[in-house]
Amino acid sequence: MKTKLAVFVVLVAALLVGCGCEKRGRGGEGARSDVQEAAMKTYVAPGYMYKYYIFKSGGHSGQVYVYGVPSMRHISTIPVFTPYPATGYGFDKESKEMLGGFTWGDAHHPSISETNGDYDGRWLFISDNANNRMARIDLRDFKTKQILGPIPNVSGNHCSSFCTENTEYILAGSRFSIPLPKGTYEKIEDYATKFKGIVAGIAVDKNTGNMSLGWEVLMPPFNYDLGDAGKGPSKDWGFWTCYNSERATGKLEVTSTQKDRDYVAAVNWPAAEKAIKDGKFKMIGGVKVIDPKNVEGIVYLLPAAKSPHGVDVSPDGKYIIASGKLQSITTVFNIEKMLTAIQKKDFTGNEDGIPVLNYDAIKDAEVNVGLGPLHTQFDDKGNAYTSLFVESAVAKWKLGTWEVVDKIPVSYNIGHLTASEGDTKHPTGEFLVALNKLSHGRHLSVGPSQPEASQLIDISGEKMGLLYDAFTEPEPHYAQMIKADKLKPIEVYPKEENK
């Protein structure tokens, strides 16, 4: 009897040691097995390297956070828009001059430089939503090398930064329409006619990465929210979502949601380049601005489900996917149908001279993904993954057949998501990270203020599987995940650069 009892005690002790954690909530042998399998997929032993880097925007911290995947360990913080005493950034002469007197920023939407639609690992661009700036980080040494701005005529650079297929431009634009040029005054009663929005292309030198203002397009007074650049057959186009096509003021939660559809703005950037070259612009705020009333073929409007937030282009460049967060669908537009509608002038109206394309002529599908769709990423098997803010879930659905094939709950209220190289021409289809707004009950208590939650999800199989919870400083607004072997960081600066 004593021998049996001793064996039993040893077995129980072994199980407790093997778990090494406090299990909360329901679970059993099956749950332990899932936990062990997840641990095997995420564990990176000391001294071993990670398979992917993930670059997360730092929101109001003004910085960029670097993590390793699959371990989800924080590796470093790259100071960008805000002084960082730990390294002296913002205190030495060079970085202080680069910050230009600003002491904070709102870092949104990192974008890794691309060649032929795939990450090339040279630079990381990121926007400052608060102060209308753009920064470039050199991924050779993980240092901020340039801050451009404030960008003239742009107010609230939220719909940024997104690289074109060969990093010719970084897309930018106004979240808030204002009287132009900046500093002028118009009555709010004249908002619909006297206020204007801007979308812009920030030109990038292909050798140095140096940024300069390429072109701006004058737009109706909508709120330009997010964007993406085309690939392949859509490579000449930049896309921006916009809401408040009502041109409303006052209680915007009511006044700006009256229409069933708002728009995705599609800008042909080679046409914008040509217009500037041909002198078809006017000077506003000291820069060259194209007015679509005077120049045809620059921009078109695609009707999209009410208050679209994210717009994402599929890896093959064929589909433009807009997610209307106040409806349960994502709308899939076909680039070939869009170009045909433009050629045939299949329009249903115009906004300040900008043609509105026939919705039924350009859409391929309305996919009923779930409640509160925001953003979409892709894998290498023809699947799309859409974040559902209201439902607190990720929906996996099939391009072409438009069927939802899987869903996984996340904790909680997901905003952005990023998959392994999931916004390039060649996603790898291994991992997805859900960037959640809330995390209550998923960690040791740290008082009333809670960290953000980043949940690592395995997307390599038929069904998605939750692997790991990580917690970040508030508040990541998008991230990108790149293969580690695409980056070639230095550890010692060449002597000739020591000037």
Model-inferred region functions:
Residues 1-7:
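Bacterial N-terminal signal peptides that target proteins for export
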Residues 9-16:
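Bacterial N-terminal signal peptides
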Residues 21-499:
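Predominantly soluble domains enriched in secretory-pathway, periplasmic, or organellar proteins
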